[in-house]
Amino acid sequence: MSEPQAPKKRAACDRCRTQKLRCLRVPDHPTDSCIRCARSRMECITSSSKRPGRPRNPNNARPQQSDPGPATCAETNPPLPAVDIPVQSLGTVDDWFNFGSLETDYEICSVPWDSVDSGFPMEGVTAAHSISSLSTPPPLVPSTTPTFLNTLATDTSVDEQFENEKCAQNEAEMLQPFGDNIDHGLHLSLLQRELSKQLFALNSMPWDMTKVMRITCLHDAEASASQVDSKYNSLAKIAKTSAEFAQLLCSIQTPIAGDGGSNVSKNASPLSSIHPRLSMADLLTILSCYMLTLSIYDSIFSRFTEQASHNPGAVNVVLQSAPKLYLGGIAVPPRLEMLSHLLCCLTSRQLRPIEMLLGLPDEYCIAWKRNGGSKEKQSGLFSGQSGQLLFSTLMRVETERAGEEKGGLGVIESLKETIRRIYEFD
């Protein structure tokens, strides 16, 4: 039998064929090199032509592949299976705010209060819960998909939406304090992350005044529909989160069983005199949550004043759809000042318990003012001398470092000024 013919070489070398150029051979060259390879002093390689299609007799090729050599074992191994990553797992705001994967210190000294990563400087502080209390919680905590992203995902199935709502419900349940054995650092970090997501969503998503500021009645026939839309309402979400914040502060101030109330040693640090169960990181996270709450309310009030000034049509829609109110049998006319006063009263009702539990100075409060003539002992978290000094010092440092941006005091003054403007609406 005649030996099989060797495959013919290509006319062009590999280099010219890759660049899709005409390959011109140098006459009488010892290695039959082309002009370009000879000028660049590179080896001119011309691979053999590969026949398209399948081999003529694949059965004959199988015995040859039964005993592969060690050099070809790696080539004959099957490729690894592809990993399917669900799209919805990459569309959550938790993935955007995954600060725990950065492996760096949580630098918050130069970050303004109204930013998403608001917090306090942590240099030179030995905390029991470490810096992780100011960032995202451990990966065992289930991440949630915010509701405003679910409204955008129109192609999401019903089962996927149910799973997202179930995860959100699980995280909301973790925010509920249970007894004295809860991890306050974990709950505070969850609360801080939830407030950060709400502020980000409020500043990045469109704001519909006809839905956010809609006035409804308990006996209204459409009350059930309004309750369904409440989870997409920024005002309803911050009201619920503020109530959870106040409940968490109340559980923190609950006396510890077996403490006796006054078992603080003389050599105890000022931090232990504020609260023995909280680290410095926890106190800073509490102040960060308070400033984030004020920033959210300030953003809502700013949106309301902007809509009331430049979009009177939306205000008329809200007032016309409001139920009829009667005072002493006299119908109350629906006007803009009534809507603005209701918003201010609702905000004061949400902020008052938080400010009382924190025990902040009057200049840092929006709704609660300390009674100067009362001699009762203040029971707020920062009502003591050490707490007042710590709070004032941190606020002053943050205001100075913020520069032109709104620091902690700037957020408070901005919200106070916006409330004054709303009261002047006519």
Curated annotation (Swiss-Prot):
SUPFAM superfamilies to which the protein is assigned, alphabetical: Zn2/Cys6 DNA-binding domain
Annotated localization: Nucleus
Keywords of this entry: DNA-binding, Metal-binding, Nucleus, Transcription, Transcription regulation, Zinc
Domain of life: Eukaryota
Pfam family, one: Zn_clus
CDD domains for the chain: GAL4
Description of what induces expression: Expression is induced in complex medium (Czapek yeast autolysate medium) supporting calbistrin production.
Inactivation phenotype: Abolishes the production of calbistrin and of the related metabolites decumbenones, whereas production of unrelated compounds, such as andrastin C, remains unaffected. Results in a significant down-regulation of the expression of the calbistrin biosynthesis cluster genes calA, calB and calF.
GO MF: DNA binding; DNA-binding transcription factor activity, RNA polymerase II-specific; zinc ion binding
SMART domains per the UniProt record, alphabetical: GAL4
Biotechnology: Calbistrin A has been reported to possess a number of interesting bioactivities including antifungal active against Candida albicans and cytotoxic toward both healthy and leukemic human cells.
Record has Calcium as a keyword: no
Primary localisation category: nucleus
Transmembrane segments: none
Classification via Gene3D superfamilies: Zn(2)-C6 fungal-type DNA-binding domain
Function: Transcription activator that specifically regulates the expression of the gene cluster that mediates the biosynthesis of calbistrins and related compounds such as decumbenones. Calbistrin A is a secondary metabolite with an interesting structure that was recently found to have bioactivity against leukemia cells. It consists of two polyketides linked by an ester bond: a bicyclic decalin containing polyketide and a linear 12 carbon dioic acid structure.
Protein name: Transcriptional regulator calC
